[in-house]
């Protein structure tokens, strides 16, 4: 089960953090809609991991003392590119690393294999540390640059899932996470046309990945 909680307020189902904040998984569940939340139960949501282990041990579960996984549990070897190729049946061709001016500075193993903010595993000797600053999936290019190039003051997106209300109609102060392990950051979310909304951060945020799901506390 997942560490999260669902509560009903009026006619709306709301997604709440788990009692065990260290194990909370609401970041990964933030795209669940009202129909899905109405049919979901999270029996672990009100328990801590220690309490779950104690219950498992009392009932003779052999994995009661199993160490917690520290990464994606279904990719035990940590080779995500190889997993993607096995899972999708696709081959991801090599492409170019570019600097901020668009100059080719090296070759990569496929843009899908990299994440914004990544430093390790690039295989580049640039004279100074560089990080993944952007990706063009159509052109299969990965742009690298200094750490300061990773900061954003806002993000804009569509296909939002609203829990307290059907639609966002006015600006709302929120706290936002753009990564699972991140501490919530203050900001304001503004409605825009055609289902889009824009979040402006009080403080610029590092490595706001375009493809990430973002969760906010309303």
Name the predicted role of every residue range.
Residues 1-216:
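Nucleotide-activated chemistry modules centered on ATP-dependent adenylation/adenylyltransferase
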